[in-house]
A protein has these predicted regions:
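Long, well-ordered core segments of solenoidal/helical folds
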Residues: 1, 46-63, 91-111, 151-168, ...
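Conserved small/polar residues in nucleotide/adenosyl-binding loops
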Residues: 2-10, 185-192
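Internal amphipathic alpha-helical repeat/solenoid segments
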Residues: 5-26, 36, 48, 56-61
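Short linear capping/connector segments at secondary-structure termini
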Residues: 8-14, 53, 112-118, 174
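Well-ordered alpha-helical segments within folded domains of soluble proteins
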Residues: 22-37, 64-81, 122-140, 188
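Structural helix-adjacent loops and short alpha-helical linkers that scaffold large soluble proteins
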Residues: 36-50, 80-93, 139-152
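Aromatic- and glycine-enriched pocket-lining scaffold segments that form the walls
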Residues: 109-170
Length: 196
């Protein structure tokens, strides 16, 4: 495979499918390799984990979607935890900086996507919660409270708006960014089969 290819999932025919590093699940496969290495300390697994982790390093500069948090924290986060490689720390700190550019204080959340703006003004999906661990880590490891403040704000707003009375969640909430503070009257729930 090319250097930028990562495994994304198993296809219907049972064969592994690959994707480019920008694909939203690109950090999961290297993250799993790090977990396998943690369990059995097999150096060949460590080598594969390092290789597949390196393939997504440029995503630390991603600012056009929210996926950067879980792409990097699953891979580089586990790599750092198991090896103390300072290069991994720098990747994570840059990734947190990139992710934080998607936060809008007026909304209190990290914007998920930039596409389909005719439907969603400021879409936030429930998956975005997976990014908060990296932001909390970055705040602690950089002494920059900004990252923790973003994570806490995002969690608070998500808890307030994303969940129904029966505790199921909407997949997408679109927030109004123009008419002032967000309230329930400014929310549009994207009703699809993707709702949890």
């Amino acid at each position: 495979r090319g250097l930028g290819d990562v495994y994304k999932r198993q296809g219907k025919d049972g064969k592994l499918m690959t994707s480019k590093a920008k694909w939203w699940t690109s950090g999961f496969f290297p993250g799993v390799l790090w977990y396998l290495y943690e369990v059995n300390q097999d150096d060949s697994l460590k080598m594969y984990a390092e290789n597949y982790t390196k393939r997504i390093e440029n995503e630390k500069y991603t600012t056009d979607n929210h996926d950067v948090g879980f792409m990097l924290y699953c891979s580089f986060g586990n790599g750092l935890r198991l090896t103390s490689n300072d290069e991994y720390k720098q990747v994570l700190l840059q990734g947190a900086e990139s992710l934080s550019t998607r936060f809008r204080p007026q909304v209190g959340c990290i914007r998920s996507w930039d596409w389909n703006q005719k439907v969603w003004e400021y879409p936030v999906i429930i998956d975005n919660m997976m990014n908060l661990e990296m932001l909390m880590w970055a705040s602690k490891n950089s002494d920059n409270p900004k990252f923790a403040e973003i994570a806490k704000s995002h969690a608070d707003v998500t808890m307030k708006h994303h969940f129904r009375p029966d505790y199921s969640s909407y997949h997408v909430i679109s927030y109004d960014t123009i008419s002032g503070p967000v309230s329930y009257t400014h929310l549009r729930a994207h009703e699809t089969l993707m709702n949890l």
